[in-house]
């Protein structure tokens, strides 16, 4: 398994390790990944992801998985997350149509 966040596609980054004498050597910064199960309230489904803690904090800040996906630009999401976002939008449109029909 590669060390990639399955929601945001974030990967390891590169930089320099700087010693006390200011010598610089190449190093990598790995993501802090966790296996989590996130629930979509709109779809009534559970999804399993390997997610970076930074992404988990953002999801917590936004409220839930649905709010995170709907408020995040599609370009920044992975393919798996984009598919879920499309399904969310379809369900929301369907609910709006049903509300409009029932009101009329």
UniProtKB/Swiss-Prot annotation:
Keywords: Ribonucleoprotein, Ribosomal protein
Signal peptide range: none
GO annotation terms (biological process): translation
Pfam families hit by this protein: Ribosomal_L28
GO annotations of cellular component type: cytosolic large ribosomal subunit
Keyword Ribonucleoprotein: yes
An MF annotation (GO) of this entry: structural constituent of ribosome
Family from the record: Belongs to the bacterial ribosomal protein bL28 family.
PANTHER family in alphabetical order: 39S RIBOSOMAL PROTEIN L28, MITOCHONDRIAL, LARGE RIBOSOMAL SUBUNIT PROTEIN BL28M
HAMAP family per UniProt: Ribosomal_bL28
The name this protein goes by in its record: Large ribosomal subunit protein bL28
Lineage: Bacteria, Pseudomonadati, Pseudomonadota, Alphaproteobacteria, Rickettsiales
